[in-house]
């Protein structure tokens, strides 16, 4: 079946490169749609969607004004073309005229292309062939929490040469393969899909929970709560991919509050609360703060009990005062939930690092957290305390049983 692949291009500085890419896609039997966001000068040839069209959609009627901005306030020119391109691509998506996106280029092209890609839904094939793909600090911004595939061109995307041609061929092969085999991004599942937050310090609870969910007729999807993973989960919740959450590892709240390595944004828990899906929340990860590789944090927490996992992963114990703030945040965000929710608290420790005899064990601090949470939560939100350690299969079963109860309540409205 013939598919439409959008090529994001700057045809004023790259001509032969995009001509080759377009011809390669068409040789595979697909429609190649060139979107030109040129800002600097006249393009070598016009795109299927011209830079003038992109400029107008961004809010500037005259492309010469964009070119003037590019010379004096380049950021504003770039932002205009990104805005215009996103509007055009959004329409193509709604009209069913878009099946994949390919970007090719250096710094500016990568920024524009990935900004467009970040506006698209999960599952839409997105490939960025970039000379910036080997730059870790930039890639973090280009990809964010989206399912964008980066291909390192190794050499710069400036005029065709044997090495660049190999990478362009590979890029076309990759995006064509994606659109040919992709099941699409509007999949209807026969069973409810449930997000389960996870990390290594709670895996003995998470893995059994996944098994128990399957037994009860759900489709579990583990989400790695390392900051990016829980942000991605929240975005997928807002896109409608999940019908419930078992949030065993809520660590992103504390990491965000205290500036740790695994900060998950200032709206953790709110996606589920505002989307009207049931959620069970447990406190795994709130007992620690990830400070590895951060001299300022290592210094600030030097007097705290610490667990050294490896040279990058150092976990410091959180204090009662910090846990009090976390409890208040969690309570406030659950209080605004439009669907049933519950909290599940283990009494014998919250992670594999938080148990008797280990550095992060502090049952008094954990108990203080629970007392603050209970006082601040709405009385209709249950807090179930269980005489278990969190990192056990038994806790995983408790989490699933509690979730199943509130899920049914949400379904029946009673």
Spans of features found by a protein language model:
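Gly/Ser/Thr-rich loops at beta-strand to alpha-helix junctions
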Residues: 10-16, 99, 103-113, 133, ...
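Glycine-rich phosphate/diphosphate-binding loop of Rossmann-like nucleotide-binding domains
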Residues: 14-24, 33, 39-49, 189-231, ...
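Short Gly/Thr/Asp-enriched flexible loops that form oxyanion-binding sites at enzyme active sites
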Residues: 103-122, 206-209, 355-362
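N-terminal phosphate-binding or glycine-rich loops at protein starts, especially the Walker A/P-loop
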Residues: 1-43, 100, 109-119, 123-128
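Cap/lid and interdomain-hinge subdomains that line or gate substrate/regulatory clefts
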Residues: 67-73, 136-201, 325, 332, ...
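Phosphate/nucleotide-donor binding subsite
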Residues: 46-97
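C-terminal non-catalytic interaction/assembly regions of soluble proteins
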Residues: 4, 13-27, 31-33, 260-414
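Short, acidic/small-residue loops that bind anionic groups at enzyme active sites
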Residues: 100, 112-142, 149-152, 221-225, ...
């Amino acid at each position: 079946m013939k598919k439409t692949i959008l090529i994001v291009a700057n045809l004023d500085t790259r001509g032969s490169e995009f001509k080759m890419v377009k011809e390669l896609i068409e040789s595979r039997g697909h429609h190649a749609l060139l979107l030109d966001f040129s800002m600097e000068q006249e393009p070598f040839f016009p795109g299927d969607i011209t830079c003038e069209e992109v400029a107008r959609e961004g809010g500037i009627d005259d492309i010469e004004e964009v070119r003037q901005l590019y010379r004096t306030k380049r950021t504003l020119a770039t932002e205009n073309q990104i805005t215009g391109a996103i509007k055009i691509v959004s329409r193509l998506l709604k009209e069913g005229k878009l099946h994949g996106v390919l970007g090719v280029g250096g710094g500016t092209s990568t920024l524009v292309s990935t900004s467009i890609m970040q506006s698209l839904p999960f599952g839409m094939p997105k490939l960025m062939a970039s000379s910036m793909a080997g730059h870790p600090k930039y890639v973090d911004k280009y990809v964010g929490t989206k399912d964008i595939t980066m291909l390192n061109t190794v050499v710069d995307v400036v005029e065709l040469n044997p090495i660049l041609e190999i990478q362009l061929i590979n890029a076309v092969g990759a995006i064509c393969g994606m659109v040919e085999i992709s099941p699409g991004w509007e999949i209807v599942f026969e069973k409810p899909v449930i997000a389960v937050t996870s990390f290594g310090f709670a895996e003995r609870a998470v893995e059994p929970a996944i098994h128990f969910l399957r037994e009860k007729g759900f489709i579990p999807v583990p989400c790695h709560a390392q900051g990016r993973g829980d942000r991605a989960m929240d975005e997928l919740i807002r896109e409608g991919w999940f019908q419930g959450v078992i949030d065993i590892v809520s660590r992103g709240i504390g990491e965000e509050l205290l500036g740790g390595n695994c900060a998950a944004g200032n709206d953790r828990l709110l996606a589920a609360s505002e989307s009207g899906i049931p959620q069970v929340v447990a406190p795994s990860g709130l007992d620690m703060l990830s400070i590895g590789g951060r001299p300022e944090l290592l210094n600030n927490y030097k007097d705290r009990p610490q667990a050294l996992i490896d040279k990058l992963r150092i976990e410091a114990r959180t204090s009662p005062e910090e846990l009090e703030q976390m409890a208040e945040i969690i309570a406030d965000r659950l209080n605004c939930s439009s669907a049933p929710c519950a909290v599940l608290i283990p009494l014998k420790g919250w992670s594999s690092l938080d148990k008797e005899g280990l550095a992060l064990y502090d049952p008094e601090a954990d108990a203080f957290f629970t007392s603050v949470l209970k006082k601040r939560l709405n009385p209709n939100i249950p807090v179930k305390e269980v005489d278990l350690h969190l990192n056990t299969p038994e806790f995983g079963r408790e989490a699933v049983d509690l979730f199943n109860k509130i899920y049914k309540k949400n379904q029946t409205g009673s």
